[in-house]
Amino acid sequence: MTNGHLHPLTQFLRVSLQYFTERGFEIAEGPEIKTEWYNFDALNTPADHPSRDVQDTFWTKGGKVLRTHTTGTDIRVIKENKLTPPLKLIIPGRCFRNEATDSTHEHTFYQIDGIAIDKDLNMGHLIGILDGYMKELFGKDLETRVRPHLYPFVE
């Protein structure tokens, strides 16, 4: 008889969350149905931004949305818990986009969002955390590089 095993996504999340918690991040979670304020306004997404359109976002009859990302959870957790720096949060979760599905797009996907606020943190810290994370996932011999780029579709 063959023993069962964990789903690949569960395995990925366990490795990911362990990596970040070992580095002082706390895991935060939030609802999959959000207010427009937490999903867009709190993140300074303009009212006329294409991501707010019905062809990109699932809207409920009550004016709420299925979250399009986990980033708005950062704001909610910090606000509701009156958190102050220093803080490190990691937010995993399922996200939804009202898109046509193809080989590179799905209406549902998982995202891991992180935020770290402290004195003297800089891009070197971010790059170090992400480099270590990629090595945790793909092996210590992985070579990474940072390639700054402008993505106007997310501006």
Question: What residues fall within each predicted segment?
Answer:
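TRNA-recognition modules of translation machinery and tRNA-sensing kinases, especially anticodon-binding
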Residues: 1-155
